[in-house]
Curated annotation (Swiss-Prot):
Keywords: Cell membrane, Ion channel, Ion transport, Membrane, Metal-binding, Sodium, Transmembrane, Transmembrane helix, Transport. It is found in: Cell membrane. The chain crosses the membrane at residues 4-24, 35-55, 68-88, 100-120. The keyword Cell membrane applies. This is Fluoride-specific ion channel FluC. Pfam families: CRCB. Its main location: membrane. It catalyses: fluoride(in) = fluoride(out). GO terms for molecular function: fluoride channel activity; fluoride transmembrane transporter activity; metal ion binding.
Amino acid sequence: MNNILAIALGAAIGANLRYGIGLWAAQRFGTAWPYGTFIINLLGCLGIGLLLTLISTRLTLSEPVRLMLVTGLLGGFTTFSTFGYESFSLLSSGNWLPAIGYMVGSVVGGLIAVIIGVGLGRWFGG
């Protein structure tokens, strides 16, 4: 499979997953706080930690499949630009405490999710 097509396929899947989870989070938790982006970015951090650890320890994937999963799927799934805009929106509307909670929670939670993903990858990888 062509690398560009593999990335495009993964990105299409990741973007649609992001859209679906974003809709679900808005219906489930409301839109006063960016729950969808928060959940998506933490799941993406968990996923990249797990996947890259498994690839480096156990899984043998072709270059197109690795690109499809990491660059395409996870790249299309997570969204740093939305995180930046939602942080700005909370700050500019005077919601300082929710904004700080969102920013700190996203960065610290993302790092913790990567650590958990790496740990899971090592555990599954033997």
